[in-house]
Amino acid sequence: YVIAQYDAAVAYMDACIQQILEKLAALGLEEDTIVIFTSDHGETLYDHDCYFDHHGMYDCTLVVPLILRWKNHLPAGLRIPGYCQLKDVTPTLLDIMGIDVDLPFEGRSLKPLIEGKPREAEPEFYITECTWMRKHGWRTPEWKLIVSLGPDFHFKPEVELYNLVKDPEENHNVAEENPEVVEVLKKRMYAFIEKREK
């Protein structure tokens, strides 16, 4: 029953989005309107002992779609492999609209990727959750470290480490078997936090 409700909510949202797109077309605004589909979080659907929740720092809650639609300005159906972050949206929009601003952004434009040009991936980055579950994390292409700052309501250990190459679904915590990796990633993460808070 719960799955059917979730599926119905997704179908309802699809129908609402279709109405918006049809209205833009009817008003002749498709070429003057950039439409962005994204989300602030994914969902745990039986993942990691969490049921229909969106807390935690596993990829099922962190990875969300980012779809840009701008008729006759952006290529339709183009899929870009890899990942970007929501901090990349603003610099991307300004870049594709040709708006130059003299402001620093943490994010980077996706326009080179849209044009088929290479862009070096961000090698590692900080992730956090600041809701009723307070956690810090550090992600590299190979590893994800999660450090809980308080009690975990899903009874997870204080430190989690996942090998994203061997275990992309993050099912096997290997923190105890890799204490040296935990320490290296913790140092990088805390150095970033200290720099950010200055």
Pin down the residues of each PLM region.
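A long, amphipathic alpha-helix that forms part
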Residues: 1-33, 96, 183, 192, ...
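Short glycine/proline-rich turn/loop motifs
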Residues: 1-5, 70-74, 165-171
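Histidine-centered active-site microenvironments of extracellular/periplasmic hydrolases
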Residues: 22-78, 85
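Generic structural signal for small/hydrophobic residues in well-ordered secondary structure
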Residues: 17, 35, 40, 65-66, ...
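A short, conserved beta-to-alpha structural element at the edge of catalytic cores
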Residues: 65, 69, 189-198
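Active-site-proximal N-terminal segment of extracellular/periplasmic enzymes that hydrolyze or transfer
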Residues: 172-180
